[in-house]
Design a protein with these regions (language model features):
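Absolute protein N-terminus
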Residues: 1-3, 18
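Sec-dependent N-terminal signal peptides
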Residues: 3-13
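Beta-strand-enriched cores of mature, soluble protein domains
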Residues: 17-150
């Protein structure tokens, strides 16, 4: 009977996940965007940024670059799709997609998906994490939170 309790305990312990928090920020330059505006007020904007800095709950930190688009309509609803590449202080890399649809260009929430990785980030491939992003003037703040199996 004791063996059964031990097996049950370890099964539950192994199935538990821990929170992983990723925070990034940067400055957006108008030089980093291309814009097409339609007569009805719809906009299609392509952004590229090479100056993002980040840190995470594991004690890692680094830089990232992202390229993507924002499509808005006359109601200022936004459809956003970005692809990002980041590297930590040890040179380990990760690649993500960040997709959201929201009621505001100024911020909102979406899903970050890890699509490739080297080193410690290989184990994160396929993990989807909800994120939030907020803009103020030329500054951007971004956070995503994942559940990682230990």
């Amino acid at each position: 009977m004791n063996i059964l309790y031990l097996i049950l305990f370890f099964s539950i312990s192994l199935g538990q996940a821990k929170d992983y928090l990723f925070e990034a920020g940067g400055i957006i330059s108008n030089a980093d965007e291309e814009l097409i505006e339609y007569p009805d007020g719809t906009k299609f904007i392509v952004y590229k940024g090479n100056n993002g800095a980040w840190k995470d709950s594991e004690g890692d930190y680094g830089k990232e670059k992202c390229i993507g688009y924002v499509k808005t309509n006359i109601n200022k609803n936004a459809e956003v799709h970005f692809r990002c590449e980041g590297a930590n202080q040890n040179g380990e890399k990760f690649w993500t997609t960040r997709i959201r649809k929201s009621d505001s260009v100024k911020g909102g929430g979406g899903i970050n998906t890890y699509v490739a990785g080297t080193g410690k980030y290989k184990k994160m491939i396929g993990i989807k994490c909800p994120y939030g992003v907020q803009y103020h003037e030329d500054a951007v703040w971004y956070t995503h939170k994942c559940k990682l199996n230990e």
